[in-house]
Design a protein with these regions (language model features):
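C-terminal segments that line or cap access tunnels to active or ligand-binding sites in enzymes
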Residues: 323-426
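A conserved FAD-binding loop/helix module that cradles the flavin
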Residues: 59, 464-487
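Active-site-proximal substrate-binding core of FAD-dependent oxidoreductases
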Residues: 262, 487-517
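A conserved beta-strand/loop element that lines the FAD pocket in flavoprotein oxidoreductases
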Residues: 244-257
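A glycine-rich dinucleotide-binding beta-alpha-beta segment and adjacent secondary-structure elements
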Residues: 191-205, 350, 408-468
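Active-site/ligand-binding neighborhood in enzyme catalytic cores
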Residues: 129-247, 431-443
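N-terminal glycine-rich phosphate/pyrophosphate-binding loop and immediately adjacent elements
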Residues: 4-146, 443
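Mid-domain catalytic core of redox enzymes
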Residues: 256-364, 502-504
Length: 517
């Protein structure tokens, strides 16, 4: 397809952040065009079809649906009236290698769990919940932590002042911007192992690495309205696509952006498929490294910072078809299982099942499961480029290790497996266009680890590379922050629906995921 038009705003990438920005801007009346290289929206939070199953590609835990939460704010700004979902209870279950089982509840039962399993941890959880509320309150004000213009600096100062006046945080909270979360943990090795495992999936590091303020908020995700979404996590992206289209915007799939360049006061965007667009504003739902690859005229500072691959993690995935009759009724959909040894590399596994009630996710008699483990992406590229036989053997070894780890806590699992599709970091580069298959954003070691949102005037970066970092609710806030910034520069603001979206399931089976082609 070859055509030329001049939309005001172009969004590169239909990940959650890009779609959040596009939907909010469309709802406010601005013309938006989204370009996505794949056939499915959502990026790492997409769902894809394989052999009759709908698998969640990467991110499998949807949080932020509690009243006043990030996804409720997103729904209001996008004009979404309801989320087809059911809240998880418990939100997840963590299985430690010593046999300790820790259910994560969002209600008062969580305190019963803490008292029973980790009695010395109660002061920590009191601090954690209070601190998490403060940070989420701040994040929901959509501040820009890395201002590069007078306008964004002014917004940051105003948001911080309003936050201090409303929340009354202790001045000591400033210290938690730099000291690690481990400082607050009791001297209980089993509890510390549990916290490290939870932080790894929520903040990309362990308690000795993650700064305390962020760690407190990351540990709060199970309390923030975790839900089973009809059709899988990709439904969030699908509803955002529909919101953009409903307001007159457009979303083009199978359009991979090849280059961007300045054209006077506008941006010219070219895709591999021959589409050429011009826009006055550009939103890149990419990693900084992905942006550098399509921008030959990128500033020297950006090129310098992207010369080396990013620090962080890749993911090794298993997409598993399960015999539903072999799964015990009532099994929680989210499970984290640990084996002895260093976390990651198949010794810590996060498993998410399609809900029992959602018949759209798999053929009759089956259920879809996504399993993931943190892995060093460099390892997979080295093998793939030097020894393909060793690469395939390593895939088999990791597959066996992950299944063995999961079976430690879920003895029914081996007998339920009917098919397994493994995936390495190479797949995340191929399908999600994440250079090197780097996923999850930066390990949150300090508050300025992320990139600035405004790269140059008229070009904004959104996604897990900017504050507040990884997760579906965090990237949604990153997108909304850019949308609000653009609207305020035009003398407008986000348009909020008077009520939050409802959270309920439609009548009948789960709503099917749609593929956009």
């Amino acid at each position: 397809m070859t055509s030329q038009s001049t939309p005001r705003i172009v969004v590169i990438g239909a990940g959650i952040a890009g779609l959040a920005a596009g939907a909010a801007l469309s709802h406010a009346g601005l013309p938006v065009t989204v370009l996505e290289s794949h056939i499915y929206p959502g990026g790492c939070a997409a769902s894809f079809r394989y052999q009759g199953h709908w698998y969640d590609a990467g991110a499998t835990l949807v949080a932020g649906l509690a009243p006043g939460g990030p996804l409720q704010l997103l729904g209001r700004t996008a004009g979404i009236e309801s989320w087809p979902a059911r809240l998880c209870d418990p939100t997840m279950v963590v299985h430690l290698e010593d046999g300790t089982i820790v259910p994560r509840y969002a209600d008062e039962r969580r305190w019963e769990t803490y008292r029973s399993l980790f009695p010395t941890s109660l002061p920590f959880w009191t601090w954690q919940e209070k601190t998490a509320r403060l940070l989420w309150d701040f994040a929901l004000r959509l501040p820009e932590l890395r201002p590069r213009s007078l306008g964004s600096l002014r917004d940051l100062v105003a948001a911080t002042a309003r936050w201090f006046l409303a929340a009354h945080p202790s001045p000591a909270i400033v210290l938690d911007l730099w000291r690690p979360l481990a400082r607050y943990l009791p001297d209980d090795p089993i509890f510390r192992r549990f916290i490290d495992a939870q932080l790894l999936i929520a903040a990309q590091g362990v308690a000795t690495d993650i700064f305390a303020l962020y760690g407190a908020a990351a540990l709060d995700l199970p309390n923030a309205g975790v839900a089973e979404i009809a059709g899988g996590t990709g439904t969030i992206a699908r509803l955002l696509v529909e919101a953009i289209q409903r307001q007159g915007g457009s979303v083009h799939f199978r359009q991979e952006v090849e280059t961007i360049e300045r054209a006077g006061t506008s941006w010219r965007i070219r895709t591999r498929q021959g589409l050429v667009l011009e826009s006055s504003l550009l939103i890149a739902n990419l990693t900084p490294w992905g942006l550098a690859r399509i921008w030959p005229e990128a500033p020297k500072w950006l090129r310098s910072r992207t010369e080396r691959p990013p620090r962080g993690w890749g993911a090794f995935m298993l997409y598993v078809s399960l015999d539903s009759s072999a799964i015990p009724p009532g099994t929680p959909v989210h499970q984290q299982i640990l084996a002895p040894g260093q976390l990651g590399e198949g010794r810590s596994v996060f498993l998410s099942l399609s809900p029992e009630w959602d018949g759209s996710r798999a053929p009759a008699g089956r259920r879809a499961a996504t399993m993931s483990t943190h892995t060093r992406y460099e390892h997979w590229w080295r093998l793939a480029e030097t020894d393909r036989t060793a690469y395939e053997a390593e895939i088999a070894r990791y597959t066996e290790r992950m299944l063995d780890t999961a079976a430690r806590a879920l003895p029914w699992l081996p007998g339920a497996i009917r098919a397994v599709l493994p995936s390495t970091s190479l797949a995340f580069q191929r399908f999600a266009r994440r250079p090197w298959g780097w996923v999850g954003g930066f390990p949150q070691r300090h508050p300025f680890v992320g990139w600035p949102t405004e790269i140059v005037p008229g070009l904004y970066l959104v996604g897990d590379s900017v504050f507040p970092g990884q997760s579906i609710p965090a990237t949604a806030l990153a997108g909304l922050r850019v949308a609000r910034r653009i609207l305020r520069e035009l003398g407008a603001d986000l348009v909020l629906a008077p009520q939050e979206p409802s959270v309920h399931l439609p009548a009948g089976e789960g709503e099917p995921v749609m593929a956009y082609r």
